[in-house]
Amino acid sequence: RICHSQMSSQPPTTTFCRVNSCYRRTLRDPHDPRGTIIVRGCGCPRMKPGTKLECCTSDKCNV
């Protein structure tokens, strides 16, 4: 699987993953209460309740 693997503030990058899924996690920016940070990567990790997590299973699906 090919997944995007960067934070929202970084230029787009992709990586080849051994697992069959990608994720996109959205969390609040601690420095800006109105802002959010988006983190992308391989797999579908378990998150604490209240964290927005989207998992998908096609190449580059976590845009």
Swiss-Prot record:
Keyword Ribonucleoprotein part of the UniProt annotation: no
Gene Ontology CC: extracellular region
SUPFAM superfamilies named in the record: Snake toxin-like
Positions of disulphide bridges: C3-C22, C17-C42, C44-C55, C56-C61
Location of the protein in the cell: Secreted
Tissue: Expressed by the venom gland.
Record-linked Pfam families: Toxin_cobra-type
Record-level Gene Ontology MF annotations: toxin activity
Key words of the record: Disulfide bond, G-protein coupled acetylcholine receptor impairing toxin, G-protein coupled receptor impairing toxin, Neurotoxin, Postsynaptic neurotoxin, Secreted, Toxin
InterPro entries: Snake_3FTx, Snake_toxin-like_sf, Snake_toxin_con_site, Toxin_cobra-type
Subunit description: Monomer.
Similarity annotation: Belongs to the three-finger toxin family. Short-chain subfamily. Type B muscarinic toxin sub-subfamily.
Additional record remark: Negative results: has no effect on M3, M4 and M5 muscarinic acetylcholine receptors.
The protein's role, per its UniProt record: Blocks M2 muscarinic acetylcholine receptors (CHRM2). Fully blocks the binding of N-methylscopolamine (NMS) and oxotremorine-M to M2 receptors, slightly increased NMS binding to M1 receptors.
The protein's name in its UniProt record: Muscarinic toxin 2
Species in which this protein is naturally found: Dendroaspis angusticeps (Eastern green mamba)
Record lineage: Eukaryota, Metazoa, Chordata, Craniata, Vertebrata
